[in-house]
């Protein structure tokens, strides 16, 4: 028996955004049947978001455990209409913005659906309010126009982009969470699910929501602060060890900061007026980091970790992707699964996270070939129309 919590959901992806793709992938990992509708002849633009040497690996990362269909809504036969399809899927994921629904070849049929699906619309900020929005409406600028990028980097340097699709993943995760909440409510109340509409910057605002009231009270924005959390006087740096390994050091509380200062400079450093209090450390952080970096650079990673553990200091190695693949704890937790890339080399992919007790892991399947499941999808919809 299939006990995956979303195995009863049929999801139709109509967009080409990373945020929508992530939302679909999250639900696919819990058993949902996710069908990506791809345009012929080239397929979804997401396939080509990276250089050609990495496209197979990339597509298998973002579209594993999904199905591909290639349906032109204008060429459907009379036996099956767009309304039939929309009425017999549970969720639609798109990225066009609500103002475009009435002219979209798929969603213009939404009002005539006998049974309305839940529509998740995650669109680039400004798409629906171009008269108010400054700059580009491309999704790539979400980190910039949400305030997140302004907080990343050194205090005396330019903003720095985070080289991970944080904005897209946040939007996808929040949309998927909201969708499941709305589906649960609509099924309990026997009503049609209400559409979920979200401009991408709205997801990232949740990450900086505490800084907005502070800015409104002080009349100026919170500034980026290097490796320190903005407005934080804790010690937080990433020094280099003697054997060329970077580590992360964190001493946020006064108690831990004192232990760290005693460790690297003894009572003289810990009691020095420049470092003895949070305010003093905040005013002299650059000098303190020079002392910390010098101490760390005189020892190997193994030595630093051992000494820090003995002194009850928060220190850990900074892993790269290869380190994670060989980390015993990751292996023991079964966080990764092997996948053969359609006759190419084997690779590893993350499995469903979080894990739910008593539910088996979904087998990791290759991302679909273009249009490989069109007939299966049409047969599925046809069967649903007969029931």
Model-derived features: positions:
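Terminal low-complexity tails and localization/encapsulation signals of metabolic enzymes
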Residues: 1-9, 240-242, 322-387
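N-terminal helix-loop segment corresponding to the beta1-alpha1 unit
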Residues: 1-189, 339, 369, 373-387
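Short, well-structured beta-strand/strand-turn elements
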Residues: 34-37, 309-323, 384-386
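Glycine-rich beta-alpha junction loops
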Residues: 41, 124-126, 200-205, 243, ...
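Mid-domain beta-loop-alpha active-site segment that forms a flexible
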Residues: 165-180, 200-208, 252, 256
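Substrate-binding/catalytic subdomain of NAD(P)-dependent oxidoreductase enzymes
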Residues: 182-224
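Active-site Gly/Thr loop motif
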Residues: 218, 222-236
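Aromatic-enriched alpha-helical interface/lid elements that frame and gate functional surfaces
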Residues: 230, 235-311, 315
């Amino acid at each position: 028996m299939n006990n995956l919590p979303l195995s009863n959901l049929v999801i139709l992806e109509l967009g080409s955004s990373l945020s929508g793709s992530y939302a679909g992938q999250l639900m696919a990992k819990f058993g949902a049947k996710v069908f990506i509708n791809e345009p012929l002849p080239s397929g979804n633009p997401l396939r080509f978001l990276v250089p050609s040497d990495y496209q197979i690996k990339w597509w298998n990362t973002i579209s594993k455990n999904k199905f591909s269909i290639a349906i032109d809504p204008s060429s459907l036969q009379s036996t099956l209409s767009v309304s039939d399809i929309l009425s017999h899927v549970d969720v639609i994921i798109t990225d066009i913005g609500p103002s475009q629904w009435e002219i979209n070849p798929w969603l213009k049929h939404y009002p005539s659906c006998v049974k309305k699906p839940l529509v998740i619309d995650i669109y680039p900020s400004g798409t629906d309010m171009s008269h108010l929005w400054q700059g580009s409406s491309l999704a790539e600028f979400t980190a910039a126009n949400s305030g997140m990028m302004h907080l990343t980097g050194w205090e005396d340097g330019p903003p720095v982009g985070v080289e991970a699709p944080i904005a897209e993943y946040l939007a996808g995760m929040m949309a998927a969470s909201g969708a499941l909440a709305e589906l649960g409510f609509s099924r309990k109340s026997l009503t049609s699910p209400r559409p979920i509409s979200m401009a991408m910057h709205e997801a990232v605002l949740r990450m900086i929501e505490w800084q907005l009231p502070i800015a409104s009270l002080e009349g100026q924005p919170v500034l980026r602060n290097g490796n320190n959390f903005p407005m934080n006087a804790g010690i937080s740096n990433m020094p280099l060890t003697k054997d060329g390994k970077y580590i992360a050091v964190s001493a946020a509380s006064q108690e831990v900061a004192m232990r760290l200062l005693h460790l690297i400079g003894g009572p003289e450093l810990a009691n020095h007026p420049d470092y003895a209090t949070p305010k003093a450390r905040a005013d002299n952080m650059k000098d303190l980091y020079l002392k910390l970096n010098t101490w760390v650079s005189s020892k190997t990673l193994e030595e630093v970790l051992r000494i820090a553990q003995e002194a009850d200091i928060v220190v850990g190695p900074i892993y790269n992707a290869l380190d994670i693949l060989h980390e015993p704890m990751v292996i023991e937790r079964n966080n990764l699964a092997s996948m053969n890339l359609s006759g190419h080399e084997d690779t590893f992919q993350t499995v469903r996270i979080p894990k739910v007790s008593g539910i088996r892991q979904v087998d990791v399947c290759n991302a679909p070939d273009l249009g490989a499941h069109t007939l299966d999808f049409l047969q599925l919809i046809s069967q649903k129309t007969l029931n």
